[in-house]
């Protein structure tokens, strides 16, 4: 089948502009394929958004694509090369178990990568087997869709297939392949790779390509590389604020897991915070708390500093001048983050305007929440609904004092109560993909029962809907002496 007929049948409008880059950035390779694949999850709503034929793709025809048994006609899949600072240590990486099938261009001109994750070994696999297990792929499907509904920029999941093979991790698990949709997979680590192992022309080609793809408005600007750096810094500041505002902890914020588009990517050891504690860590390999909840803004800044270092030759031919430009740009992150963070927190507290003591008010609430081990999400839900059930925090003198200050501040707004509540409801999710709910969904799914997962996914489509039907998803996990721990799944 040629590309035209394939497009007519599936809705995929295919290109691969990444192949226009110098060949140090990729390696052409076909997926290994699956012997006995089965379509486990297909994202019908995402398929519709992309203008795809969901009926055809949710069939054996689509299954063969998602299982790596068929590739897009006329387009060679590629594994992308990149580097990464893993827990601060620089290393050569690349797609060790993923292949970019191509790019889908929607009718309104938006371009999306279509990538298979878990499709077999590549030249970048190092010691890995190139495969993925079912539970981590379903986990990414659930959480990425949850993040999307929360309004947080993220890669999406189009499909998950089981391969019919077993993969060895801590134990033997069902093999799987995830089809991931992303604005692109260009990472901070891609630029670090170009700066370390490429020529100046390679670096320039990558920057020009990325600007054209993600920031076309600056493509013809005289100082486009400086503006490029500033745009990426701004997007990351916005993204991290959105993470923090819902208690999302990425878990492995290496430079290879920060994409230039400003989307959330790679959901391996991520989790959502229940009890508010800035030191919260879930990842089994984050022994020192490098990527703890409260440290995520600092880690984003650290990653962006590495990005600016990679761009130095493009910022100015004179190294000293380039360093000064980079420092000035990087210094803006903290100001931007603070601005976006307090704006978001004002909205979570029903405040439309900015006042001098707002920061103290916000910090006062958070410190009280930490002291009394309040649930992050449910505390803001309680404030939104004006219903207080957590005796420990809400009966404390600190909270009562804070509550009076907050009510006084709301009076200064002089807004109708309905307006205030609507603002709070639109910024305080009623439900999130809580860790114990996700784990229950995965546990059942591994046994072949997808009922709970399907119900959870349906509920997560409307996280800001304060519906009685969703109340069961607001319940906290049972108290346990065993802390919740996440794993990369690789």
From Swiss-Prot:
Tell me which family the UniProt entry assigns to this protein.
Answer: Belongs to the SELO family.
Species for this entry: Clostridium perfringens (strain SM101 / Type A)
Looking at the Swiss-Prot or TrEMBL record, what is one Pfam family this protein matches?
SelO
Q: Which residues form the active site?
A: 256
Could you tell me what this protein does? Answer: Nucleotidyltransferase involved in the post-translational modification of proteins. It can catalyze the addition of adenosine monophosphate (AMP) or uridine monophosphate (UMP) to a protein, resulting in modifications known as AMPylation and UMPylation.
What EC identifiers does the entry list?
Answer: 2.7.7.-, 2.7.7.108
Q: Which UniProt keywords apply?
A: ATP-binding, Magnesium, Manganese, Metal-binding, Nucleotide-binding, Nucleotidyltransferase, Transferase
Question: What is this protein's gene name?
Answer: ydiU
The name this protein goes by in its record:
Protein nucleotidyltransferase YdiU
Q: Name one GO molecular function term.
A: magnesium ion binding
Which residues does the record give as Mg(2+) binding sites?
Answer: 257, 266
Q: Does the keyword ATP-binding apply?
A: yes
């Amino acid at each position: 089948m040629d590309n035209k007929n394939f497009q007519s049948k599936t809705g995929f409008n295919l290109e691969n502009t990444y192949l226009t880059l110098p060949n140090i950035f990729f390696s052409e390779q076909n997926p290994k394929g699956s012997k006995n694949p089965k379509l486990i999850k297909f994202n019908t709503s995402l398929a519709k958004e992309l203008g795809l034929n969901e009926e055809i793709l949710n069939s054996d025809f689509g299954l063969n694509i998602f299982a790596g048994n068929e590739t897009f006609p006329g387009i060679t899949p590629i594994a992308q090369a990149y580097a990464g600072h893993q827990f601060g240590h620089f290393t050569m990486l690349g797609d060790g178990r993923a292949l970019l099938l191509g790019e889908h261009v929607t009718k309104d001109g938006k371009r999306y990568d279509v990538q298979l994750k878990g499709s077999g070994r590549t030249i970048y696999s190092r010691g890995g087997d190139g495969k993925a297990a079912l539970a981590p792929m379903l986990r990414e499907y659930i959480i990425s869709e949850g993040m999307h509904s929360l309004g947080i920029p993220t890669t999406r999941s189009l499909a998950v297939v089981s391969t019919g093979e077993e993969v060895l991790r801590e134990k033997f698990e069902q093999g799987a392949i995830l089809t991931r949709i992303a604005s692109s997979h260009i990472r901070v680590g891609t630029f670090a790779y170009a700066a370390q192992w490429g020529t100046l022309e390679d670096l320039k080609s990558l920057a020009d390509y990325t600007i054209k793809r993600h920031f076309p408005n600056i493509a013809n600007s005289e100082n486009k590389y400086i503006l490029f750096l500033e745009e990426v810094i701004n997007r990351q500041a916005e993204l991290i604020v959105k993470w923090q505002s819902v208690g999302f902890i990425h878990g492995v914020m290496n430079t290879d897991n920060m994409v230039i588009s400003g989307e959330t990517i790679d959901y391996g050891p991520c989790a959502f915070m229940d009890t508010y504690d800035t030191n919260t860590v879930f990842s089994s390999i984050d022994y020192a708390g490098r990527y703890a909840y409260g440290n995520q803004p600092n880690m984003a800044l650290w990653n962006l500093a590495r990005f600016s270092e990679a761009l130095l030759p493009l910022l100015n031919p004179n190294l000293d001048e380039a360093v000064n430009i980079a420092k000035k740009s990087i210094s803006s992150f903290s100001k931007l983050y603070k601005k976006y963070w307090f704006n978001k927190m004002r909205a979570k507290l029903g405040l439309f305007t900015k006042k001098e003591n707002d920061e103290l008010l916000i910090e006062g609430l958070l410190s009280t929440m930490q002291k009394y081990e309040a649930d992050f999400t449910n505390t803001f839900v309680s404030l939104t609904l004006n219903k207080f059930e957590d005796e420990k925090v809400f009966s404390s003198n600190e909270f009562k004092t804070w509550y009076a200050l907050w009510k006084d501040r709301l009076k200064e707004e002089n807004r109708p109560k309905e307006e205030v509540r609507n603002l709070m409801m639109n910024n305080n999710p009623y439900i999130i993909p809580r860790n114990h709910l996700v784990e229950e969904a995965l546990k059942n799914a591994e046994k072949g029962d997808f009922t709970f997962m399907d119900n959870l996914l349906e509920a997560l489509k409307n996280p800001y809907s304060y519906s009685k039907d969703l109340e069961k998803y607001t319940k906290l996990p049972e108290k346990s002496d065993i802390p919740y721990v996440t794993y990369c799944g690789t």
